[in-house]
Amino acid sequence: MDRSMFEIDHKKDEQLVSVEGYCKPGSDLIQGVQFKTNLRISEIIGFEKAIFGNPTTFSLAEDGKKIIGFHGYSMANLNSLGAYFTWISPTKMEAKGGKGGTEWNDGAEHEGFTKIYVQGGCDGIQYIKFDYVKDGQHKYGSPHGVKGSESTEPFEINHLDKEYLISVEGYYDEGDSGVIQGIQFKTNIKTSELIGDKKGRKFSLAANGKKIIGFHGYADKNLNSLGAYFTTSPLISLEHTTGSDLVNHIWDDGSFEGVRKVYVRYDSLEICYVEFDYDNKGKVEKREHGMFYSWVQQGEFVVDYPNEFITSVEGTMRTESFMQVASLTFKTSKGRTSSTFGSPSDSKFLLESKGCGVVGFYGRCFSSIFDLGAYFRPLPPPSNTEKVEAKGGDGGASWDDGGFDGIRNIYIGHNKMGIAFVKFLYDKDSQIVVGDDHGSNTLLRVDEFELEHPGEYLISVEGSYDVVDGSESEVIRMLRFKTNLRTSQLFGHETTPSFILEKECHKIVGFHGKIGKMLHQIGVNVLPITD
């Protein structure tokens, strides 16, 4: 008797969300099952196809919930299967806006939305109301603020068509009124018009890879502030399959934050090998599939993650004898297209989901790639940050922390060659975000520069770089940081500055660069100063 196991990694916040099953025609015998988590999908355990007749199928799933247990009936075989569900714990994002009004909270136990009503007035947004879906039923929400006499056209969300809310952008008055002035909603399919005025301080409610399932905030005669509850957005899987039962090596990378790089090896007939560099919360994870032949052609495609995502994969198939993937082409959210790897045929396929980016791949292979599928999630809202080009040498591997609201702490490790380690503590929505370690702080002296956030912010970085003994490319030798209030001590070696990273009327809210055994490059991400 064959045994199979599908492991779920709770350390990655992976949760079982559904089970698909296949029953033998004319009986209650379950002949195959397939498990789906919020991150990946298992192979089919057992049989999907029946020898006589088509199997009946069943699904165990409840929107917005996870499976926490099973029940069923069995004798010599498994005859029935049921599941116990509970709500997936949401993430609460604090309310953005002014401090006035009375607190309200719609809660988070919803699957999604059907309609959003918003009414503007002379002083800003007067009124907001959300109609939710709970346990598959329409739930009318409570109004927040004061509704005027004018009729309000709702922003409709087609929950039945798997449409869901992924972000809210708006503006609020920082003066005494503290009222939200304008607001705009974005789903995985469309974006509403801006309701109200584009004035005041801009805010955003969004979380990469998550959807909004509820709101909270403060209101009186107007809407003073708005916050949201998030849960993991559905994972979309698309595949091209030959349907061949002869290829038995199934692989599934699962899903990550995004794709950083793609490597392909190919000859004139087929794609022999693929390798993907994924981003796993700032760390690179490699996955490789197929046969690594050293004598065939090779190519790579680098993605500027987190500012860029692969949005589609175009491929062709060999149709003689076995059907192998003959060519692959990748397109990104920035409108870039990779080289075509392989020799295209007339048999084409496309992996693409509108408004989404690729976060993982799966497929079948042996001596070449036979089937290919991809996991998609909605693209994150475009960042308002601007990237200032990194300075330094070309050594090491690229890293990019992205953009936040500000900088809280800077940690610098240095040795006799220069800067070997950097780490930053950021601020996002008044919460501390711990950046990744870049380099190794083992046996190094690590110094700290702490900013008095939120009143103090970083406006420039000056430094120097040079070739030193033991390094083939230039390394960062010195760094010094300047805020709106003061200048830090010098980190590293006393040398003449050779670069300054800054942009007029902007503050630094993130860092990027290249790191190996030493820091080779450093650059910054900036936002306009609005304070």
Swiss-Prot record:
SMART domains recorded: Jacalin
GO molecular function (one): carbohydrate binding
Keyword terms of this UniProt record: Lectin, Repeat
Top-level taxon of the source organism: Eukaryota
CDD domains, alphabetized: Jacalin
A Pfam family reported for this protein in Swiss-Prot or TrEMBL: Jacalin
Record domain Jacalin-type lectin: where: 1-87, 90-232, 235-378, 385-528
InterPro entries according to UniProt: Jacalin-like_lectin_dom (IPR001229), Jacalin-like_lectin_dom_plant (IPR033734), Jacalin-like_lectin_dom_sf (IPR036404)
PROSITE patterns tied to this protein: JACALIN_LECTIN (PS51752)
Keyword Repeat among UniProt keywords: yes
Family statement drawn from the similarity comment of this UniProt entry: Belongs to the jacalin lectin family.
Name this polypeptide is given: Jacalin-related lectin 16
Organism this protein belongs to: Arabidopsis thaliana (Mouse-ear cress)
Lineage: Eukaryota, Viridiplantae, Streptophyta, Embryophyta, Tracheophyta
Gene transcribed to yield this protein: JAL16
